[in-house]
Amino acid sequence: MKLSDISAKLGCALEGDGQVDIVGIAGIEEAEAGHLTFLSNPKYKAKLRHTKASAAIVPADFEASAAWPLPLLRHANPYLTFAHAIELFYSPPPAPHGVHPTAVVAPTAVCGHNVRIGASSVIGEGVVLADGVTVYPNCTIYPGVRIGRNSTIHSNCVVREHVVIGEDCIVQNGAVIGADGFGYAKQADGTWYKIVQSGSVVLENRVEIGACTTVDRATIGETRIKSGSKLDNLVMIGHGSSVGENTLLCGQVGLAGSSTVGRNVMLAGQVGVAGHLHIGDNVVATVKSCIWKSVEANQVLYGNIPASDSHTWLKASAVFRQLPHMQKSVQQMQKRIAVLEEPFKTNGKSGQADAPPKVALECHGTTGDAPQG
């Protein structure tokens, strides 16, 4: 495809030879001749100068010298433009055609137009698959599930009873939507009694669920993932939780039960959220942050412990074990300082001139009286 054609399709300003042939998309360091690459972070500008790519997508205000070595496509949002460029060259694998002969579809299930169901998938009683739904092979859709238009369920997924999935959703391989929440009551003999998880899960429109992610059903009521939210692989959503619109949860994030996450929140990898907490809109939590209390909107949280060399870590660990004793020592020093400061406070209140406190000097290893002032 000619670079000029790509420029027109992406709405970019072309700078340089538009007749260059582009055969694919690649990163700055991996690109070869014929590839289109991109730059969204200015700190990689030096690498762009030495790339083997035939052209690059860059920010609209990118400063290039007159002798810049390759043609440029300028755009205000180069990363989003890069995402659109991939679509010009990527051909997804073909979806199942119609209903595979080995699929099991209950007689009470309702399938809309252009529904595709792959081999060995099971569609339960009363399931409703709207127009354009695709269910890849080896999926199990329990009774009473409703899946909205143009949503895709990839292979080896399980969607449990009465779950509702909206339009244009994507559920990646191995995800489980609507498994029982983790709810037990302790009995008199010390054993655990399983609490029936009678609620459900609702995925609103344009939600994406990553591979092997689990979203548990509520004990009562619902667990809800709101429109436009994206959950990475291996994310765990506890029962009764709610995730707001356009929120990103990265790999291995865990929400304990009844957590409420606001809109446009970003939780980085391995962030943990304790149960029954509220996280406000636009909060960002960095990698491995432990959120143990509710967070107001528009906060940035740093709660991780960075890795360090073993020598430094062992020294820090030794100090950590001494903290209780150190705290006691600090408290004792604070009390002594308060005693020393008391005469100053008293003199100040009475209007008398401050005088230094009399402090007894205890001399060790000597005989005789202390020096007299």
From Swiss-Prot:
Pathway assigned to this chain's UniProt record: Bacterial outer membrane biogenesis; LPS lipid A biosynthesis
Reaction(s) catalysed (UniProt annotation): a UDP-3-O-[(3R)-3-hydroxyacyl]-alpha-D-glucosamine + a (3R)-hydroxyacyl-[ACP] = a UDP-2-N,3-O-bis[(3R)-3-hydroxyacyl]-alpha-D-glucosamine + holo-[ACP] + H(+)
Keyword tRNA-binding: no
GO biological process: lipid A biosynthetic process
Single GO MF descriptor: structural constituent of carboxysome shell
Family membership noted in the UniProt record: Belongs to the transferase hexapeptide repeat family. LpxD subfamily.
Role, per record: Catalyzes the N-acylation of UDP-3-O-acylglucosamine using 3-hydroxyacyl-ACP as the acyl donor. Is involved in the biosynthesis of lipid A, a phosphorylated glycolipid that anchors the lipopolysaccharide to the outer membrane of the cell.
Protein name: UDP-3-O-acylglucosamine N-acyltransferase 2
